[in-house]
């Protein structure tokens, strides 16, 4: 640490020269033991400008944009430091898998994906590094607060009772927001100052100033550099203080200031989407015979026996009788191997994939899963309207996401309060 600080002190003058009078990178901020350099800031500013242009937003003043980008880099650096302290790493194979999913979601192969990234002026190596950072930050956030995110059945029912009827749970709200930050324990004076600042911004918006540009210039929120765009969120995903407001807002309306844990917010309702849809699932009535290696049966014997049972069934032996005689799944064996009606996702993937591909009353060849070797027969299929259970599960997921976002914001606020942050370039302070 002392060596790093000594180096930083040598750079405080702003311009230093190496051997041969080569201009060195200027330090613009110190974050604990790390530094953020001018070149890092410049690169992120240029990237932000491209994003602002691509989204057809008004370009903010250069000096204001640089300040906002620096604050973003400080937040990222703090979370990357936490990832390092916790020994969190991302393997190259994980990055490859993530990029493949991104490409597939955009209907591109990897070659086309690489071309698109290059067209945006980003090298493939830079893109991979950005993906690595995003994954590291996601993982460290999950480690920091994920274990504390619990949503009970009672909370789901209470939400549906008081905030969102089941038939409306599919609606989405496209929001933008501006955050005027507060410390963890603000004084009365700090509260008043932040509220006045938020009210002044609201007045500017009412007079016609662009919400997105003001978000880029003034907001401390995670999405400030995207014009404060939160995207489309279901009601249960929104902070409760937002949800109470948004259901009464008209498209285009701006509400606030709204007091939340991390500051005062202004929110703009951009659009309302989604519609009430029925959710229908295919249930499968299935039975199986399970053989698995154990102390009395080595793997080769289990494979030999399951193949022998398969041949006997193919020759006309009764499946239920064979299950009662040979299956090692005690719970279903007494019922002739019958597992009853199962929903999608209830069985292990290898079993379900084979089951879904089988015609009715046809017995599968032996299928290997973590439990052993299975013979599978589909007895019947039916369609079931699962809308109520599905939407309750959606609400549970949305409430989990709401709690997670709020917990992450509090954690980020705490990280900042505990960190040593020195903005060396006073033009950026």
Curated annotation (Swiss-Prot):
Localization (cell): Periplasm
Pfam families listed in its UniProt record: Rotamase, Rotamase_3, SurA_N
One CC-aspect GO term: outer membrane-bounded periplasmic space
EC number(s) per entry: 5.2.1.8
Top-level EC class as recorded in UniProt: isomerase
Alphabetized InterPro entries for the sequence: OMP_Chaperone_SurA (IPR050280), PPIase_dom_sf (IPR046357), PPIase_PpiC (IPR000297), PPIase_SurA (IPR023034), SurA_N (IPR015391), Trigger_fact/SurA_dom_sf (IPR027304)
Signal peptide range: 1-18
Location (main, coarse): periplasm
Catalytic activity: [protein]-peptidylproline (omega=180) = [protein]-peptidylproline (omega=0)
GO biological process, one term: protein stabilization
Keywords: Chaperone, Isomerase, Periplasm, Repeat, Rotamase, Signal
Keyword Isomerase appears in the UniProt entry: yes
Gene Ontology MF terms: peptide binding; peptidyl-prolyl cis-trans isomerase activity; unfolded protein binding
Protein biosynthesis among keywords: no
Domain PpiC span(s) in chain numbering: 170-271, 281-380
Function summary: Chaperone involved in the correct folding and assembly of outer membrane proteins. Recognizes specific patterns of aromatic residues and the orientation of their side chains, which are found more frequently in integral outer membrane proteins. May act in both early periplasmic and late outer membrane-associated steps of protein maturation.
Comment text on domains: The PPIase activity resides only in the second parvulin domain. The N-terminal region and the C-terminal tail are necessary and sufficient for the chaperone activity of SurA. The PPIase activity is dispensable for SurA to function as a chaperone. The N-terminal region and the C-terminal tail are also required for porin recognition.
Name recorded for this polypeptide: Chaperone SurA
Organism in which the protein naturally occurs: Legionella pneumophila subsp. pneumophila (strain Philadelphia 1 / ATCC 33152 / DSM 7513)
